[in-house]
């Protein structure tokens, strides 16, 4: 198989994630977060010409990368849409059952590293954070047009910030004179109302604010919930869903979505032998290894989880 130019991008948990799919060479798989194709290429290496791989990504740059590097693979199909619409899109290919889904949640490294995309709190750019460059809502609209109450809500809910009020007050004060246009402009505003002690911590003080804005702009948690629910329903017997998550909110969505298929609604004291259609596959390590951390520090917060359908 031909090598793929990855532009030095290293996919998170590459071997662990693809190994966990337990790939059968003639089956159907879906990489729900194509990015720069690291996971997809590894999956394709394990498929025969009869096997099929469908990949999803909203990003225009990801589509260009696919066209330049993956169009040669006749059993690989790019779908430019949010993975929350996986069921509807796969139906267009007459696909109702899938043998494995891979989700690598959050923002991709190429998006973070491209200053023009406005995701990074370390690189100066216009506030954007859109995974889908064609949508209207961006970080600029959120920061400059949302009410005080709504900003407080998203920072508390999506950033898990205990008291975002001082920072929100500073945002409202600043934007009353001029729009907040760039990422570093926003970082400076956050800094003004962040205690020195927190500014000196290892994790960047603006990280959770940017996370909250990004989740709001891209409706990430609702997308995860719908996609996982549909993936569970479409999964073939012995098929697996592999998720790579990066923070507690993503992990909570995964746990809550799986809860209905893993927990019995029948009280324990009722003498009925419960059988479940799904089981969690225990993977070691759930966290990235030290060697992978040396190659890609962004794997530090990654968490791998695998669920398998055991009954139709």
UniProtKB/Swiss-Prot annotation:
Query: Where is this chain primarily localised?
Result: cytoplasm
Keyword Cytoplasm: yes or no?
yes
MF annotations from Gene Ontology: rRNA (cytosine-N4-)-methyltransferase activity
- What Enzyme Commission number(s) appear in the record? 2.1.1.199
Q: What is this enzyme's catalytic activity, as reactions?
A: cytidine(1402) in 16S rRNA + S-adenosyl-L-methionine = N(4)-methylcytidine(1402) in 16S rRNA + S-adenosyl-L-homocysteine + H(+)
Q: Where does S-adenosyl-L-methionine bind?
A: 37-39, 57, 83, 104
Subcellular location field:
Cytoplasm
Instruction: Recite the UniProt keywords alphabetically.
Output: Cytoplasm, Methyltransferase, rRNA processing, S-adenosyl-L-methionine, Transferase
- What function is annotated for this protein? Specifically methylates the N4 position of cytidine in position 1402 (C1402) of 16S rRNA.
Annotated NCBIfam families: 16S rRNA (cytosine(1402)-N(4))-methyltransferase RsmH
Q: Provide the protein name.
A: Ribosomal RNA small subunit methyltransferase H
The gene for this chain is rsmH
């Amino acid at each position: 198989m031909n090598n793929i130019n990855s532009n030095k991008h290293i996919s998170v948990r590459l071997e662990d994630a693809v190994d966990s799919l337990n790939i059968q060479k003639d089956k159907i798989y879906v990489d729900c977060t194509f990015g720069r194709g690291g996971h997809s290429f590894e999956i394709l290496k394990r498929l025969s010409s009869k096997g099929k791989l469908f990949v999803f990504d909203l990003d225009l740059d990801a589509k260009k990368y696919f066209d330049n590097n993956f169009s040669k693979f006749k059993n690989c199909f790019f779908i430019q849409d949010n993975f929350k619409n996986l069921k509807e899109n796969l139906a267009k290919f007459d696909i109702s059952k899938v043998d494995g889904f891979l989700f690598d949640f959050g923002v991709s490294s190429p998006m973070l590293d491209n200053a023009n995309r406005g995701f990074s709190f370390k690189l100066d750019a216009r506030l954007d954070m859109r995974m889908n460059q064609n949508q209207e809502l961006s970080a600029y609209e959120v920061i400059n047009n949302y009410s005080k109450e709504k900003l407080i809500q998203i920072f508390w809910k999506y950033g898990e910030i205990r008291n975002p009020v001082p920072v929100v007050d500073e945002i409202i004060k600043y934007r009353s004179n001029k729009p907040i246009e760039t990422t570093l402009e926003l970082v400076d505003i956050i800094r003004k109302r962040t205690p020195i002690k927190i500014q000196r911590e290892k994790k960047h003080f603006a990280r959770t604010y940017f996370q909250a804005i990004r989740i709001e702009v891209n409706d990430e948690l609702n997308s995860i919930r719908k996609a996982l629910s549909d993936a569970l329903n479409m999964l073939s017997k012995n098929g697996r869903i592999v998720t790579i998550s990066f923070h507690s909110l993503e992990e909570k969505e995964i746990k809550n979505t799986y809860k209905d298929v893993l927990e019995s609604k029948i009280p324990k004291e009722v003498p009925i032998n419960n059988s479940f259609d799904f089981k969690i596959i225990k993977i070691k390590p759930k966290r990235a290894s030290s060697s992978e951390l040396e190659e890609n520090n962004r794997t530090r917060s990654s968490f791998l989880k695998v669920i398998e359908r055991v009954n139709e």
